[in-house]
């Protein structure tokens, strides 16, 4: 499979309401499988520090929240499209709080994207497992094992 990922900065100096509307349209029309959105941060010593049209931090943060809410709907639809499909999943470890084995698909970067939640004790870190997706959430999916390959030693760490 393939997943398209991007990152947006909201509130860059000179960003207008029309620019922000274009960003909203991009998120809803392009439908990135994975998207990060961050507020512009005025950093001394950068070319943008003294640029005219600085956007107030509260406005930038509100724009981030709005774009991420749009992306939540995109992610929900993407995850729902995975239900019933069998996907290869790399097992990362065990989440003691969730009491679940956790892993990630080909579309998920470690520590920044959602996870695949699996039944406790079903696989070891480093194993590639075929997982049939059974439930979809905004940023995670749940699944059941379809097949297991041997673990690759030393390639994963346990998650707290």
Give names to the regions the model predicted.
Residues 1-46, 66-77:
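Conserved C-terminal portion of the radical SAM core fold
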Residues 50-160:
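Terminal RNA-binding accessory module
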């Amino acid at each position: 499979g393939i997943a398209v990922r991007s990152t947006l900065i909201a509130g860059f100096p000179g960003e207008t309401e029309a620019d922000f509307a274009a960003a909203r349209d991009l998120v809803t029309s392009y439908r990135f499988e994975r998207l990060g959105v961050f507020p512009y941060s005025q950093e001394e010593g950068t070319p943008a520090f003294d640029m005219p049209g600085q956007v107030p931090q509260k406005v930038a943060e509100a724009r981030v929240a709005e774009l991420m809410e749009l992306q939540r709907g995109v992610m929900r639809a993407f995850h729902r499209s995975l239900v019933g499909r069998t996907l290869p999943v790399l097992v990362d470890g065990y989440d003691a709080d969730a009491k679940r084995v956790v892993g990630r698909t080909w579309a998920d970067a470690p520590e920044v994207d959602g996870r695949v939640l699996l039944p406790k004790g079903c696989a070891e870190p480093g194993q590639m497992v075929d997982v049939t997706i059974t439930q979809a959430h905004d940023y995670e999916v749940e699944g059941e094992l379809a097949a297991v390959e041997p673990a690759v030693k030393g390639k994963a760490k346990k998650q707290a």
